[in-house]
């Protein structure tokens, strides 16, 4: 098996070059420009965090990714799915409220935010995979 390339940047920031700018450079170095995004919807899957915790990426990083997608002609949007467990992300309305309270808004990330599985987390489709098998249907 071929070894994967690993890209690294440190957290030190120089005047005029913060972490979001470094993230943009990393994306380009990793080959994001090889992906045809011209006039296509581009989902940026992200965890919006639970209320009261800090285990999610900050809005400025999401904006950096969305900006690169736009530069490549894509139409980015941030997305996540509702949770199966009770909490602040169990339905789309509360999920979006949670995202907003954690600083993730269309204004701060530079693109729309959509909950992928609908209002109650029940909007889904089955996609058959050639050569795949179902464990339980």
Predicted region positions:
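N-terminal and secondary-structure boundary signal
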Residues: 1-137
């Amino acid at each position: 098996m071929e070894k994967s390339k690993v890209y690294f940047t440190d957290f030190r920031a120089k005047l005029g070059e913060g972490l979001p700018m470094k993230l943009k450079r990393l994306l380009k170095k990793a080959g994001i420009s090889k992906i045809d995004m011209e006039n296509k919807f581009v989902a940026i899957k992200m965890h919006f965090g639970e209320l009261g915790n800090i285990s999610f990426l900050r809005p400025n990083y999401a904006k950096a990714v969305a900006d690169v997608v736009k530069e490549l002609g894509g139409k980015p949007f941030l997305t996540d799915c509702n949770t199966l467990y009770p909490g602040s992300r169990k339905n789309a309305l509360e999920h979006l409220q949670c995202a907003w309270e954690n600083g993730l808004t269309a204004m701060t990330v530079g693109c729309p935010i959509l909950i992928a599985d609908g209002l109650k987390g029940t909007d889904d489709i089955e996609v058959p995979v050639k050569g795949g098998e179902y464990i339980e249907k």
